């Protein structure tokens, strides 16, 4: 029976253990507060150090800028002094004799004259070349074609660049949406992880509280068993003592009664002590449970506030994103409209210029055709006039021959001799005319060869100009003075 009884100071030891546990919790809380204070102090110190470093860097850059400015000023001052010294030396060395100055002036005048003549020749060549380029219809046609081809190529290049730019913008938007989706998934995963960790923490706290409640209940059950065992032992002792003292004398019975009264008083006091300890334990358990419940409620309120704040931030973020996308869409549409309008205006202007050029070219060709028709009519008139002259000469020759024959039949030998002489003169004239016709034919052949040679030179010049020059960016209308 004595072996199963708990030591008298068991409850005191348990109270001391509980007090030590509470003291340890308070010490841990103080250590945690101290660590938080140290972390805040380190953060403030780091911020101050960074600010000092930035200020030092700013001061160093400012000092270096001032040093560079002073160095540049010194270099400029040295350069000015050197130029001043060189100018003084040049002024001192420029003192020459009148003969030297006259010779230098003459040499300079000859050099300027040669330079001016070279510039005049170059300007004349340039102006001749420019006049040839502007007055050559073949070059104008080729340049018009080259400008048209270049315009088409540039327009195609701009269209391709615009399409590539739109494709790149679409790809950037797609990548941006993908990145936004990835970030959103990461945020949701972090939120779920935080929720899981909070749930695990709450479960751990509940498990610890359940373990503490179980231990408290076990301690209560053990204390109750000890009390019941002690009461049963005391009752058994009392009954044994009462049974042993029944046969004693009255004094012993009185003593036993006094002892029983003292024992009852002891039991009452003991019972009061046990009730006070139970009440303290229950109040402590209730206090611990209330603190745990209040902490859990505070955590849930903080979590709800955090979720509401994150939801508000996501809503504002989506609204800002929608506004940015709408603004970008409006700017893109407006820019495309301006580009299309400018392109249409440019095409209309180019079409008007091409129509004006075609009209000017058509008028020029009409004028050239009219001039050629006039020249052809003049040549035909000259040929008809020459044919009439030849016919008149042949008729005159026939008349003269008939007259000579009639005169030859009527006249004597002297007249025949004169007729023969005139015939010889006529033959000489005919031979001379034949020679003149041959010379005219040779002259026409020479003119044709010269014309062909000039045309070949003209074609070579055109080809050389086309290969050595670029088409003009703007080819305006010329005024022709025929």
From Swiss-Prot:
Pfam families: TPH. Keywords: Cell projection, Cilium, Coiled coil, Flagellum. Residues 462-482 are annotated as: Disordered. Its main location: other. It is found in: Cell projection, Cilium, Flagellum. GO terms for biological process: cilium movement. Transmembrane segments: none annotated. Residues 9-40, 67-124, 152-413 form a coiled coil. One of its GO terms (cellular component) is motile cilium. The keyword Coiled coil applies. The keyword Coiled coil applies. PANTHER family: CILIA- AND FLAGELLA-ASSOCIATED PROTEIN 53, TRICHOPLEIN KERATIN FILAMENT-BINDING PROTEIN FAMILY MEMBER. May play a role in filopodium movement. Belongs to the CFAP53 family. This is Cilia- and flagella-associated protein 53. It comes from Chlamydomonas reinhardtii (Chlamydomonas smithii).
